[in-house]
A protein has these predicted regions:
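Terminal targeting signals and extreme-terminal segments of soluble enzymes
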Residues: 1-147
Length: 147
């Protein structure tokens, strides 16, 4: 049975929040048509020795927002990140970290999406863009999506 767009987006959200890697991030996500927004609370468990979040946290937020913006368009198979370029522009050591992704181009074989990350004050702290492609793994076979 084919899901509606709304049902697909909610299933993607459930898949993301329930993924084991996100246990320590406790993210909130909202997926829409060609868009995704993700928020996490910054905690010192994400910090490097200099007292700010490690760049991998911001990178993950950028990739995830771009990935789910791209995934919003594909309702039959899992999407894969084939490349992702990021720019980390400001350290973050407290508050909320939010990333907003959007699709910027699509053709038969790939989707290009970008994301911008913001600190709690609304300042840009990073940006990135990536190329996303369809995999062969059907979404219906992924338990966290199918729930």
């Amino acid at each position: 049975m084919k899901r509606t767009d709304e049902a697909h987006w909610r299933a993607l959200e459930g898949m993301y929040v329930g993924s084991p890697i996100n246990t320590s991030y406790a993210p909130q996500i909202e997926v829409g048509h060609e868009t995704a927004s993700i928020e996490i609370e910054v905690g010192d468990h994400f910090f490097h020795a200099a007292g700010a979040i490690h760049g991998s946290v911001t990178w993950k937020m950028l990739d995830d927002a771009s990935f789910f913006a791209a995934s919003s368009l594909i309702d039959d198979v899992f999407v894969l990140t084939t490349s992702f370029t990021s720019y980390l522009t400001r350290p973050v050591s407290e508050g909320m970290l939010r990333s907003v992704g959007r699709v910027v181009n699509r053709n038969r074989s790939q989707i290009v999406a970008e994301a911008v990350a913001y600190d709690q004050a609304g300042r840009e702290v990073g940006r990135g863009n990536g190329i996303f492609v369809r995999s062969r793994m059907e979404l219906a076979t992924i338990p966290l999506y199918a729930q």
